[in-house]
Regions:
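Bacterial N-terminal signal peptides
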Residues: 17-28
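Sequence signature of WD/YWTD-type beta-propeller architectures
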Residues: 30-583
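Intrinsically disordered, low-complexity proline-rich regions
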Residues: 6-9
């Protein structure tokens, strides 16, 4: 039991303390979490614990989550506290507050980490069931109930709570201890997160050609909306007959855009619809990027972004003369953990005007000597930040075939971030952003804070986005000294998005599992960020989260999205074409 009375320094224990200790030992058979102001249990036990701990030097506990300095958003669901303590068999958890709130005391025998439920439909020979790492398998956990967590949050607003875990051995006293400090922010997340929920099921087809997902499994891709104050997400779109990919919303949350594959594997369809509780995408809502006669031949839209006011769409276009394999490096692997490398090697930025139906290259980002991609709007719509590199063949002659992510046989490309005026579509001179360019690394996927002050981007050795070595950096939007963000995890940090109030960033990572999860970090007015906070239970344990994006709508602002664009050539012929301007 907890603790062994024979090991106690009896001369220092008063009878009342001994009685209280016996009560605590009985309660520790389960989990007890109380605010101890009224019963006084923690106060009465304090001299007992002090007496036990005094004669010995306590071994350190590895406190894995949350990390010291973590900042939680108000109202988020209770987190799982995770630690490693090889010799402990029971633990006390003591939480004290800088605002003098009533301390919280819990005792527990701990629970081992476990894998959540899997989706049986996404189990395949090409992937493996999620499993704990050796470190995770050695971990112990404690999750406060909703009432206890609410009390912790209420007393830690903008002032750190100190969490102390003390370990005990069966038959002995206190053996180990560690502590962290954590805070609850006053800044709400203020918006739900829209994200793509995908199976990781690479498939080998005819002649051994590998696809990230077999055509027969496309319908397993889901889109979800998550309110972080709720324990589960809500599926808003599923059972798509064709693949749909990158999505974006206008800053006001009124317009939604998404790349959708059309008939004959046409990669040039784009949906633009108003955001409503019940949304429907039909043929009339589709823009066809491809010129007439090129359906199914050319991929001309990539990383499309709706403007802040919803009037324009910015995208990467390779031009009508270049086919997919002439403008993109694409390699797929049977390794489900990192199953694809995909990045453009040629292309220009062009903008589409919804009011005129005209697509026009943007001067300053339309030089065919370069690949210009990943374009994003400033919050006021006055300038564009984008990634640029010298254009090249996706597969130079004699190049070997890459067999895994970060293989030296990948086509090498390092992007630099540039800024160019939009100037009502007239563009201007593109200038490199200091701190995010010409540093020997690949700088990509920029996202500008809603107040226009900060730029968060991905940095990796080669290519962009879903790289094992992807790290998040922050730099002043006009350029300056970059900082590696504290929120970075050990493996793949990417697909980030700012909350509408500019105080939170959501991003994806494979830190805990090859099945990608999403995390939050708080960013203050000076651009300082906090350790990563897991958004738990975003999907099944054997499915991956990508492209999480905050949407400036109420938490229940989208209930469902219906897609009624039939996979038929006749429908494609009826779709509106985006007229070329100077292109």
């Amino acid at each position: 039991m907890f603790p062994d009375f024979r090991a106690l320094p009896w001369l220092k224990i008063k009878p009342l303390a001994l009685f209280t200790l016996c009560a605590a030992a009985v309660l520790s058979a389960g989990l007890m979490a109380t605010q101890t102001g009224a019963p006084g249990l923690h106060r009465l036990l304090a001299p007992v614990y002090a007496a036990q701990d005094a004669p010995r030097t306590l071994s350190p506990i590895s406190f894995d989550y949350p990390e010291d300095g973590s900042i939680f958003p108000p109202g988020i669901t209770p987190p799982m506290f995770i630690w490693r303590d090889a010799a402990g068999t029971s633990w006390s958890i003591d939480i004290t507050f800088a605002d003098k709130g009533a301390p919280i005391h819990a005792v527990t025998r701990g629970e081992r980490m476990h894998i959540g439920a899997s989706d049986p439909d996404t189990v395949a020979d090409s992937n493996s069931p999620p499993k704990l790492t050796l470190q995770q398998a050695a971990s112990w956990t404690w999750t406060p109930d909703a009432r206890t967590w609410a009390a912790i949050q209420a007393d830690s607003v903008d002032q750190p709570a100190t969490v102390v875990i003390t370990g005990y051995r069966d038959g002995g006293g206190a053996f180990s201890r560690s502590q962290i400090r954590m805070t609850t922010s006053r800044d709400p997340v203020s918006a739900p997160i829209f994200y793509r929920d995908v199976p990781l099921m690479p498939s080998a087809g005819v002649n051994g050609v590998v696809s990230p997902l077999a055509p027969t499994a496309i319908h397993l891709i889901h889109w979800r909306l998550r309110d972080i104050t709720k324990p589960e997400s809500h599926t808003v779109l599923k059972d798509m007959p064709t693949c749909a990919n990158c999505h974006s919303f206008s800053a006001d949350g009124k317009t939604f855009g998404m790349d959708i594959d059309g008939p004959a594997n046409d990669k040039g369809l784009y949906a633009l619809v108003p955001v409503q509780k019940h949304m429907t995408i039909q043929g009339k809502d589709m823009v066809h990027w491809n010129p007439a006669g090129d359906i199914g031949k050319t991929r001309v839209g990539f990383m499309s972004q709706v403007s802040p006011d919803g009037r324009y769409v910015l995208s990467t276009f390779a031009g009508p003369s270049l086919k997919l394999l002439e403008s993109y490096y694409v390699t797929n692997f049977m390794d489900y953990r990192f199953l694809q490398v995909f990045f453009p090697t040629r292309g220009v930025l062009a903008w589409y005007d919804r009011s005129t139906g005209v697509r026009t290259p943007l001067p300053g980002a339309d030089d065919p000597k370069y690949v210009q991609t990943d374009g994003v709007w400033s919050p006021d719509g006055k300038y564009i930040v984008f990634a640029r590199a010298e254009a090249r063949d996706p597969r130079p002659p004699g190049q070997g075939k890459a067999t895994h992510a970060l293989d030296a046989n990948e086509t090498q490309i390092q992007y630099d971030l540039y800024r160019v005026p939009f100037n009502d579509g007239k563009g201007g001179v593109a200038e490199p952003i200091a701190g995010a360019s010409h540093n020997g690394m690949s700088n990509n996927f920029p996202k500008i804070s809603p107040d226009g002050r900060w730029l968060v981007f991905v940095q990796c050795k080669n290519g962009q986005l879903m790289r094992p070595d992807s790290q998040l950096y922050i730099v002043p939007a006009e350029g300056g000294t970059p900082r590696r963000m504290r929120a970075n995890t050990r493996l793949m940090n990417s697909w980030h998005s700012w909350s509408p109030n500019g105080r939170w960033l959501v991003f994806s990572s494979k830190a805990r599992s090859p099945y990608t999860q999403m995390y939050l970090t708080h960013i203050d007015a000076d651009g300082n960020d906090s350790p990563a906070i897991l958004i738990d239970n975003a999907t099944a344990a054997n499915r991956a989260v990508n492209i999480p994006e905050f949407v400036n709508i109420p938490a229940d602002g989208i209930d469902d999205i219906q897609v009624h664009v039939a996979d038929e050539p006749a429908v494609a012929a009826a779709l509106p074409k985006a007229a070329n301007g100077t292109n």
